[in-house]
Design a protein with these regions (language model features):
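Short glycine-/aliphatic-rich beta-strand segments at the starts of folded cytosolic domains
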Residues: 2-15, 101-104
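Short amphipathic alpha-helix segments
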Residues: 15-30, 112-114
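Short, charge-patterned binding micro-sites
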Residues: 35-54, 73-88
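Short beta-strand-to-loop capping motifs
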Residues: 46-51, 105-107, 139
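Short, conserved charged micro-motifs
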Residues: 52-57, 111-115
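Helix-adjacent hinge/juxtasegments
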Residues: 58-109
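Non-DNA-binding regulatory cores of transcription-related proteins
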Residues: 112-126
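Conserved small/polar residues in nucleotide/adenosyl-binding loops
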Residues: 142-144
């Protein structure tokens, strides 16, 4: 079995798309995954699965929509992939405050057209870089 981090997007933000973590754990366990654990109310889950990541994503998304009645995009990473993201640290030379260092995850490489649109935005003092399926972002100031 492989240990995965399963990241659910857009749940438990405000009043829409609420999912109780106990219900989420119960669903994923019923789907055949082992060692299912959640982090706070974030929708971040770790679990063990025999399925490859490419099968796990649509399987979990379908189960969530069936059980809760709304679509939930899911991103999956193995422990090793997450460790590699941390080790890579492409903005480490400018990112001096970890609370303002963000990594956004995607299931596929960030498309060229998205990268072109990002390049057209003036980030002021913010810095970002795209590396495969990750967008690393350093927020120099909290913009109000």
């Amino acid at each position: 079995m492989t240990r995965y981090a399963v990241l659910l997007r857009g749940i438990n933000v405000g009043r829409a798309h609420r999912i109780a973590m106990a219900d989420l754990r119960e669903l994923l366990t019923a789907e055949g995954h082992a060692g299912v654990a959640t982090l706070l109310q974030s929708g971040n889950v770790v679990l063990d699965s025999d399925r490859p990541a490419g099968e796990l994503v649509p399987s979990v998304e379908q189960a969530l929509e069936w059980r809760f009645g709304f679509a939930v995009p899911v991103v999956v990473r193995t422990r090793e992939e997450l460790l590699a993201v941390v080790a890579k640290d492409p903005l480490g030379s400018v990112a001096t405050d970890p609370s303002r260092y963000v990594v956004s995850f995607s299931n596929a490489p960030v498309p060229a057209e998205v990268q072109e649109r990002l390049a057209a935005v003036d980030p002021e003092d913010d810095v970002y870089t795209v590396d495969g399926r990750e967008l690393y972002l350093w927020l120099s100031l909290i913009h109000i």
